[in-house]
Amino acid sequence: MKQYLELMRHVRDNGVRKEDRTGTGTVSVFGYQMRFDLSQGFPLVTTKKCHLKSIIHELLWFLNGETNIAYLNNNGVKIWDAWATESGDLGPIYGAQWRSWPAQNGETLDQISQLIEQIKHKPDSRRLIISAWNPALLPDESISPQDNVRNGKMALPPCHTLFQFYVLEGRLSCQLYQRSADIFLGVPFNIASYALLTMMIAQVTGLAPGDFVHTFGDAHLYLNHLEQVDTQLQRQPLPLPTMAINPAVKDIFGFCFDDFELQNYQAHPHIAAPISV
């Protein structure tokens, strides 16, 4: 995962101080891109141990169109708890936009289902795109995430905003545009999540996984993560693991947690860091 370390080092060494919504402060750059060949291993960071269980359950939760943390909590995943209401609701975040985008006449669009059909029948299309950025439902920054949910808005605006697929010579590639990226805590999750999603969609459309391309807008290191960043940059990357997926699953909505097996994952110890809310 040298690509990830290069991103981290670039922002640490070349970023500029910038204030942010959380009040923590960041070192930030605007515009950066990484590329991962998924045939060369599963891109899970090895210079600190990552919690793959949370990544898989969150992705399945998105694909199921869910926006309440009950499923996550029932599976020991707490990564969304800080923004949810007392009843566990997060408003129309990723899952709702992926599976139930508001359309005309009160109807909704299932972007994921449409994407699968397009890849199968129009693989050369330049419209193989999923968007989670719905301006009408973005939260009001002057009130809390919970109050936004009560007003029918998202608890948080989507950070990983839009992704596009590309089919060439039987291989499926994906490019993600991420408008805002917490490099130390969030980006390892994002890389693994979209790499896995690409592999899943490739399987159900009869393709091989290609590249995952990760494009950033505001890529930042929080000021209270810089010590941890220095620690991680001193570590040497280990060989990438592989991800085995149950080959019997042919429906993108048919996957469950037990259909995934991470193999040969070696990682340096976890590095704790505070979350900026």
UniProtKB/Swiss-Prot annotation:
<feature type="binding site">
    <location>
        <begin position="126"/>
        <end position="127"/>
    </location>
    <ligand>
        <name>dUMP</name>
    </ligand>
</feature>
<protein>
    <recommendedName>
        <fullName>Thymidylate synthase</fullName>
        <ecNumber>2.1.1.45</ecNumber>
    </recommendedName>
</protein>
<feature type="binding site" description="in other chain">
    <location>
        <begin position="220"/>
        <end position="222"/>
    </location>
    <ligand>
        <name>dUMP</name>
    </ligand>
</feature>
<dbReference type="InterPro" id="IPR045097">
    <property type="entry name" value="Thymidate_synth/dCMP_Mease"/>
</dbReference>
<keyword id="KW-0808">Transferase</keyword>
<dbReference type="InterPro" id="IPR036926">
    <property type="entry name" value="Thymidate_synth/dCMP_Mease_sf"/>
</dbReference>
<dbReference type="GO" id="GO:0006231">
    <property type="term" value="P:dTMP biosynthetic process"/>
</dbReference>
<feature type="binding site">
    <location>
        <position position="51"/>
    </location>
    <ligand>
        <name>(6R)-5,10-methylene-5,6,7,8-tetrahydrofolate</name>
    </ligand>
</feature>
<keyword id="KW-0489">Methyltransferase</keyword>
<comment type="function">
    <text>Catalyzes the reductive methylation of 2'-deoxyuridine-5'-monophosphate (dUMP) to 2'-deoxythymidine-5'-monophosphate (dTMP) while utilizing 5,10-methylenetetrahydrofolate (mTHF) as the methyl donor and reductant in the reaction, yielding dihydrofolate (DHF) as a by-product. This enzymatic reaction provides an intracellular de novo source of dTMP, an essential precursor for DNA biosynthesis.</text>
</comment>
<dbReference type="GO" id="GO:0005829">
    <property type="term" value="C:cytosol"/>
</dbReference>
<dbReference type="Pfam" id="PF00303">
    <property type="entry name" value="Thymidylat_synt"/>
</dbReference>
<feature type="binding site">
    <location>
        <position position="182"/>
    </location>
    <ligand>
        <name>(6R)-5,10-methylene-5,6,7,8-tetrahydrofolate</name>
    </ligand>
</feature>
<dbReference type="InterPro" id="IPR023451">
    <property type="entry name" value="Thymidate_synth/dCMP_Mease_dom"/>
</dbReference>
<dbReference type="GO" id="GO:0004799">
    <property type="term" value="F:thymidylate synthase activity"/>
</dbReference>
<feature type="active site" description="Nucleophile">
    <location>
        <position position="159"/>
    </location>
</feature>
<comment type="pathway">
    <text>Pyrimidine metabolism; dTTP biosynthesis.</text>
</comment>
<feature type="binding site" description="in other chain">
    <location>
        <begin position="179"/>
        <end position="182"/>
    </location>
    <ligand>
        <name>dUMP</name>
    </ligand>
</feature>
<comment type="subunit">
    <text>Homodimer.</text>
</comment>
<comment type="similarity">
    <text>Belongs to the thymidylate synthase family. Bacterial-type ThyA subfamily.</text>
</comment>
<keyword id="KW-0545">Nucleotide biosynthesis</keyword>
<dbReference type="GO" id="GO:0032259">
    <property type="term" value="P:methylation"/>
</dbReference>
<dbReference type="InterPro" id="IPR000398">
    <property type="entry name" value="Thymidylate_synthase"/>
</dbReference>
<feature type="binding site" description="in other chain">
    <location>
        <position position="190"/>
    </location>
    <ligand>
        <name>dUMP</name>
    </ligand>
</feature>
<feature type="binding site" description="in other chain">
    <location>
        <position position="21"/>
    </location>
    <ligand>
        <name>dUMP</name>
    </ligand>
</feature>
<feature type="binding site">
    <location>
        <position position="276"/>
    </location>
    <ligand>
        <name>(6R)-5,10-methylene-5,6,7,8-tetrahydrofolate</name>
    </ligand>
</feature>
<keyword id="KW-0963">Cytoplasm</keyword>
<dbReference type="GO" id="GO:0006235">
    <property type="term" value="P:dTTP biosynthetic process"/>
</dbReference>
